[in-house]
C-alpha cells in the first residue's frame, strides 16, 4: 500500500529524517526534516524550514500518485510470478526425463508471461477485502489462463 514515507524515499536523495507518520501536508511539515550535516558530536543538524528542503509537499503527493498507479501492475506481476513458480516442477519433470514439454503447458506459461502487456489490472476497492487479504485484483480486470490439468 502506498505511503507518503515511501514517496519521500523515492524522490529525496538528500539526507532527511521523518519523526512520525505523514498523512497530509500538515503532518509532512511537522514530521519531515532535511539533514544539513552533523555537529561535533555527530548528531544530525536538522533544518525545519520547508523553504530549504529539497522536496515539497506537491513533490510528495505527485510521487504518491505514481506509486498508487503502479501498484495494480506490481500485484499482477507478483501473482503471475507465483503461478509461474508453480510451473517449475512440471518443467523440471519434463526436462529431467528429456521429454518435450506439452503444448498446453507452453501456452499456459507464455500466457502468464504475457499478462502484463495484455491487461490493465485494477485493485479491489473494498476496505474489508484489503484488511482480510491484502491487495487483490478485481476478477474483471485480469483473465488468468486455465492451468492445464495434465502433469
Where are these regions (language model features)?
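A preference for well-ordered globular domain cores
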Residues: 1-151
Amino acid at each position: 500500500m502506498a505511503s507518503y514515507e515511501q514517496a519521500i524515499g523515492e524522490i529525496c536523495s538528500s539526507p532527511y529524517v521523518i519523526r512520525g507518520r505523514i498523512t497530509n501536508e500538515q503532518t509532512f511539515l511537522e514530521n519531515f526534516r532535511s539533514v544539513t550535516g552533523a555537529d561535533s558530536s555527530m548528531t544530525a543538524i536538522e533544518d525545519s524550514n520547508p523553504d530549504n528542503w529539497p522536496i515539497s509537499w506537491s513533490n510528495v503527493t505527485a510521487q504518491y500518485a505514481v506509486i498508487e498507479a503502479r501498484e495494480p501492475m506490481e500485484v499482477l506481476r507478483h501473482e503471475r510470478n507465483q503461478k509461474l513458480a508453480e510451473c517449475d516442477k512440471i518443467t523440471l519433470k519434463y526436462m529431467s526425463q528429456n521429454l518435450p514439454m506439452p503444448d498446453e503447458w507452453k501456452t499456459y506459461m507464455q500466457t502468464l508471461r504475457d499478462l502484463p502487456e495484455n491487461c490493465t489490472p485494477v485493485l479491489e476497492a473494498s476496505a474489508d477485502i484489503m484488511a482480510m487479504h491484502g491487495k487483490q485484483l478485481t476478477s474483471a480486470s485480469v483473465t488468468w489462463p486455465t492451468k492445464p490439468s495434465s502433469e
